């Protein structure tokens, strides 16, 4: 039987949006395994999935970097990015252990599990990058992620987006990309230059939205 291994970051809102996909795979006869929060393991098992908890050390890291306490968008993004980078040191090895236990044919990895994404990219199985929210990829005419700016599709708006993008999300990237590449290099992966590179490294990306 074809086996699937799904790995989420330590947040309820990251397993729930993934469940319709996992249940559909199970309905089609696949053996679906999940690694998620310990508080969600019983629910996943009740739904007919094989489930185990992720490394218990991952969840407390969020308490060290509360993005809600930030005073501006840039600071909030920096806190979140720092949290993901710290967790990556743990979720990468945790995911690798899960792969060794399950020996899956297909991997599904949460967008916020940066270490697990590196592990997935470095191995040879097919894999999916899963995001429970719209991914902040750059695109022409779209305001930069973070400040909540309205779309302003004219020359002045494009200048605004370029400047604000460098000051906010661009600044966060410059501080965090070296930490991501520090995980990638030992895995034999080429360095990334942006968050876009990290997301688009996957052979397939699934994005949930409210529309």
Predicted regions and their residues:
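N-terminal subdomain of nucleotide-sugar transferases
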Residues: 1-52
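Structural motif
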Residues: 3, 105-106, 204
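Short, acidic/turn-prone active-site loops that include or flank metal/cofactor-
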Residues: 10-12, 55-60, 131-136
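Conserved nucleotide-sugar phosphate-binding/catalytic loop shared by glycosyltransferases and other
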Residues: 34-79, 158
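A short helix->loop->beta-strand "cap" motif at the edges of active sites that frequently abuts
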Residues: 49, 123-126, 202-203
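Conserved nucleotide-sugar donor-interacting segment of glycosyltransferase catalytic cores
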Residues: 85-158, 211
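Active-site-proximal region of nucleotide-activated glycan assembly enzymes
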Residues: 128-211
């Amino acid at each position: 039987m074809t086996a699937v291994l799904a790995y989420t970051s330590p947040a309820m809102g990251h397993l729930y949006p993934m469940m319709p996909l996992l249940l559909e795979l199970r309905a089609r006869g696949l053996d679906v395994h999940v690694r998620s929060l310990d508080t969600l393991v019983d629910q996943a098992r009740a739904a007919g999935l094989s489930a185990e908890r992720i490394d218990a050390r991952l969840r407390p890291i969020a308490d060290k970097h509360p993005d809600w306490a930030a005073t501006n968008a840039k600071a909030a993004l920096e806190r979140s990015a720092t949290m993901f980078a710290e967790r990556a040191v743990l979720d990468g090895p945790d995911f690798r252990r899960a792969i060794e236990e399950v020996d899956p044919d297909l991997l599904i990895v949460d967008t916020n599990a940066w270490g697990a994404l590196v592990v997935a990219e470095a191995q040879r199985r097919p894999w999916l990058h899963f995001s429970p929210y719209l991914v902040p990829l750059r695109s022409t005419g779209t305001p930069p992620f973070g400040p909540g700016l309205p779309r302003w599709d004219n020359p002045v708006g494009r200048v605004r987006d370029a400047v604000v993008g460098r000051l906010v999300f661009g600044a966060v990237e410059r501080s965090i990309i070296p930490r991501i590449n520090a995980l990638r290099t030992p895995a034999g992966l080429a360095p990334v230059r942006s968050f876009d590179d990290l997301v688009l490294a996957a052979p397939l990306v699934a994005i949930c939205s409210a529309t």
